[in-house]
Amino acid sequence: MKLSVYGKGGIGKSTTSCNISVALARRGKKVLQIGCDPKHDSTFTLTGFLIPTIIDTLQAKDYHYEDVWPEDVIYRGYGGVDCVEAGGPPAGAGCGGYVVGETVKLLKELNAFDEYDVILFDVLGDVVCGGFAAPLNYSDYCLIITDNGFDALFAANRIAASVREKARTHTLRLAGLIGNRTSKRDLIDKYIEAVPMPVLEVLPLIEDIRISRVKGKTVFEMAETEPSLLTVCDYYLNIADQILARPEGVVPKDAADRDLFSLLSDFYLNPPKQTTEAIAPEALLV
């Protein structure tokens, strides 16, 4: 099974991806996480350091694929999750999508691409150009990370449009949304009324999740010394269980940009009225 994780930049994709990868491993699956971001920090919380990238390794070998060994590019992370960082071209030059293609090509050359039960692509930002939409070509499911805000849902809608386009020629489906760092889901619910799709989980704003990123650890690893975090791990295990059940998924029908803008902005301009219970007149007497 191959998964692609997308979402607005800074929404917590890498932190979420790493914890989902560990959750899948806890369910007995052999997992490979591939970071598809020039920052090459997707797997930081799994390995605790910035691992060398595929592109760095290929450049050092003058792009002689036959001189590259699995141990040159695949690093073992926490929980037995294997990690790869695609890397990227220099800033302002080249195509990141090309790098993703080279990464898949190399892993196939190493006979590593088919050795895993689950491969998870963690893809940068919300700019789903043809290049960075490349992981969708290899994926069975797309997961979109969002919060309860306007910008993240607007980005989610653009990603949904990319999934719909890729699904024309690939067996790709949208598994659903994952709400992250949000105490509410009212705007998410408003969006999925207009654009029907599953919501796999909504994670509240938990400071320990943010801290885990800074520490270079997954929540699962932190829970080994802080048992109170086991309840947080359950969120990710729930997501893993839903994915492993191979959901039917959807081919989303994204909303037109202007329609979505009106829908989401109207939610803020004309918020739903709070319903309050009627107060008996005698209760007002002092």
Swiss-Prot record:
<dbReference type="GO" id="GO:0016636">
    <property type="term" value="F:oxidoreductase activity, acting on the CH-CH group of donors, iron-sulfur protein as acceptor"/>
</dbReference>
<keyword id="KW-0547">Nucleotide-binding</keyword>
<keyword id="KW-0460">Magnesium</keyword>
<feature type="binding site">
    <location>
        <position position="129"/>
    </location>
    <ligand>
        <name>[4Fe-4S] cluster</name>
    </ligand>
</feature>
<protein>
    <recommendedName>
        <fullName>Light-independent protochlorophyllide reductase iron-sulfur ATP-binding protein</fullName>
        <ecNumber>1.3.7.7</ecNumber>
    </recommendedName>
</protein>
<feature type="binding site">
    <location>
        <begin position="10"/>
        <end position="15"/>
    </location>
    <ligand>
        <name>ATP</name>
    </ligand>
</feature>
<dbReference type="GO" id="GO:0005524">
    <property type="term" value="F:ATP binding"/>
</dbReference>
<dbReference type="GO" id="GO:0036068">
    <property type="term" value="P:light-independent chlorophyll biosynthetic process"/>
</dbReference>
<keyword id="KW-0149">Chlorophyll biosynthesis</keyword>
<keyword id="KW-0479">Metal-binding</keyword>
<comment type="similarity">
    <text>Belongs to the NifH/BchL/ChlL family.</text>
</comment>
<feature type="binding site">
    <location>
        <position position="39"/>
    </location>
    <ligand>
        <name>ATP</name>
    </ligand>
</feature>
<dbReference type="GO" id="GO:0051539">
    <property type="term" value="F:4 iron, 4 sulfur cluster binding"/>
</dbReference>
<keyword id="KW-0408">Iron</keyword>
<feature type="binding site">
    <location>
        <position position="14"/>
    </location>
    <ligand>
        <name>Mg(2+)</name>
    </ligand>
</feature>
<comment type="subunit">
    <text>Homodimer. Protochlorophyllide reductase is composed of three subunits; ChlL, ChlN and ChlB.</text>
</comment>
<dbReference type="Pfam" id="PF00142">
    <property type="entry name" value="Fer4_NifH"/>
</dbReference>
<dbReference type="InterPro" id="IPR005971">
    <property type="entry name" value="Protochlorophyllide_ATP-bd"/>
</dbReference>
<keyword id="KW-0067">ATP-binding</keyword>
<feature type="binding site">
    <location>
        <begin position="180"/>
        <end position="181"/>
    </location>
    <ligand>
        <name>ATP</name>
    </ligand>
</feature>
<keyword id="KW-0602">Photosynthesis</keyword>
<dbReference type="InterPro" id="IPR030655">
    <property type="entry name" value="NifH/chlL_CS"/>
</dbReference>
<dbReference type="InterPro" id="IPR027417">
    <property type="entry name" value="P-loop_NTPase"/>
</dbReference>
<keyword id="KW-0411">Iron-sulfur</keyword>
<feature type="binding site">
    <location>
        <position position="95"/>
    </location>
    <ligand>
        <name>[4Fe-4S] cluster</name>
    </ligand>
</feature>
<keyword id="KW-0560">Oxidoreductase</keyword>
<dbReference type="GO" id="GO:0016730">
    <property type="term" value="F:oxidoreductase activity, acting on iron-sulfur proteins as donors"/>
</dbReference>
<dbReference type="InterPro" id="IPR000392">
    <property type="entry name" value="NifH/frxC"/>
</dbReference>
<dbReference type="GO" id="GO:0019685">
    <property type="term" value="P:photosynthesis, dark reaction"/>
</dbReference>
<keyword id="KW-0004">4Fe-4S</keyword>
<comment type="function">
    <text>Component of the dark-operative protochlorophyllide reductase (DPOR) that uses Mg-ATP and reduced ferredoxin to reduce ring D of protochlorophyllide (Pchlide) to form chlorophyllide a (Chlide). This reaction is light-independent. The L component serves as a unique electron donor to the NB-component of the complex, and binds Mg-ATP.</text>
</comment>
<comment type="pathway">
    <text>Porphyrin-containing compound metabolism; chlorophyll biosynthesis (light-independent).</text>
</comment>
<dbReference type="GO" id="GO:0046872">
    <property type="term" value="F:metal ion binding"/>
</dbReference>
